Structures are given as structure tokens and as C-alpha cells.
Amino acid sequence: MRCMTDFARSRAGLGALADSPQLDLSAEDKAADVLRCDSFSHTACGREFTYWMQQAGYLSEACWHVGENLAWGVGTYGTVRSIFRAWMRSPEHRRNILGDYEALGLSRQVGELEGQADTVVWTAHFGSHCETATS
């Protein structure tokens, strides 16, 4: 997923996003929350997506520019290629991938969601400090 993200950004004349262990952790915790609550939502279990960024220590300063992409699929619909293609076809998700961010955290978790076993949940958390973001 990271390679596809960096490739898409490169084609758009943008730089690669830095790895962020904190955003990786927040993305992992968010995907786990989606599966635990059986709720595919940016507010799974009643928590805003920024909750997990705060828990991971990413939003420790006053001003951040952040975004979240979330997807799920079963079988071939849960592959990296399938999910990335869907994100790039969605204006909101594409905006995050090509957005003015400096860091990326990713998670892929498998579990049961909405009665579907072996569901793959993908989470991408994007972030940058407001001083470096222009949007």
C-alpha cells in the first residue's frame, strides 16, 4: 500500500510520505476498533478517527492537519490493489492520498465484520503539522 501511495504521489509531482510509527499504531488501533465493534465507520465505537491519533501520541501539539482512509473487503476485494484502486476512484480518499501531508501510517487487519469472516480492514492515517500544511 505504501509503494502504491508513493507511486501515485510521484506521478502527481508530490514527494513520498514519511513513515510514522505513531500513525502506524493509530491506524492499527482504528482497524482493531472497527473489527471489535463490528462497525465500519470513521467513528467506529463512537470514537472520532483522531482519538486513535491522540492515543498514539501523534496529536501532541496544538495544530495538526490529518486525514483517514478506511476500507474493507473480502477475497479479491480486500487486496492492496483492489482497495487502492477504490480509494483513487473516490474523490475524498484520493484527496487524502495526494494531499499536503508529510507522514503516513498504515494497517491491514483481518477479522469478522458484518457477519463476513476473513474480512480485510485497511486503514491509512495521514498527518502533518499545520506549519508545513497549506490546506
Q: What kind of feature is each model-predicted range?
A:
Residues 134-135:
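Short, solvent-exposed mixed-charge patches
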Residues 1-54, 58, 100-105, 109-111:
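Short, well-ordered surface patches within globular domains
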Residues 49-130:
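A well-ordered secondary-structure block
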